[in-house]
């Protein structure tokens, strides 16, 4: 059973953190059974597709791809590892008409994420103020990703940027 935080607890935490506490509010699709039906019975639903950051100061949905691995693959077994990876790679590429991406093949463009499927998990979103004029946005980090390789160069290692910028 998921613990519901009462208003008294929220007010106390808000006071203790001088208003900096963040509270998750799951707005959409709370019924995981219905969501499972949508994800498994339709070949047209790819949760990794987002709004390109249009609402980064209000909502956080960047953890979806990690959630596919941690929840739908590892915890529930809804997808095999191969199916989970397809939901994040070739499936969305096809939907978007990106014919040169989505699979690892000679001549294709590819960023490669190296991860430990037994460790991948999404962390709590955090609010940062790194937009122009100190405007806020939510970011969500993860655990279990070992490296991101772009055009043969490691750009992220163990969650930290390496400074290498090999993208085109």
Regions from the PLM with identified roles:
Residues 8-15, 19-36, 40, 44-50:
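Non-catalytic terminal accessory segments
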Residues 41-62, 107:
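Short acidic/histidine-rich active-site segments
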Residues 17-21, 54-57, 92-95, 120-123, ...:
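Flexible loop/turn segments at secondary-structure boundaries
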Residues 22-33, 82-85, 93-127:
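Acidic, glycine-enriched loop/beta-strand segments at the rims
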């Amino acid at each position: 059973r998921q613990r519901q935080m009462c208003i008294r607890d929220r007010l106390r935490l808000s006071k203790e953190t001088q208003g900096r506490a963040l509270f998750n509010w799951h707005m959409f699709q709370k019924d995981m059974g219905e969501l499972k039906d949508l994800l498994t019975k339709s070949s047209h639903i790819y949760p990794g597709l987002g709004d390109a950051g249009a609402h980064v100061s209000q909502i956080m949905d960047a953890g979806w791809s990690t959630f596919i691995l941690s929840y739908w693959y590892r915890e529930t077994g809804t997808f095999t590892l191969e199916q989970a990876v397809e939901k994040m790679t070739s499936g969305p590429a096809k939907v978007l008409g990106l014919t040169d991406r989505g699979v690892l093949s000679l001549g294709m463009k590819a960023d490669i994420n190296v991860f430990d499927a037994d460790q991948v998990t999404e962390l709590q979103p955090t609010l940062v103020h790194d937009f122009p004029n100190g405007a806020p946005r939510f970011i969500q980090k993860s655990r279990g990703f070992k490296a991101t390789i772009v055009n043969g160069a490691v750009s992220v290692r163990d969650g930290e940027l390496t400074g290498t910028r090999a993208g085109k």
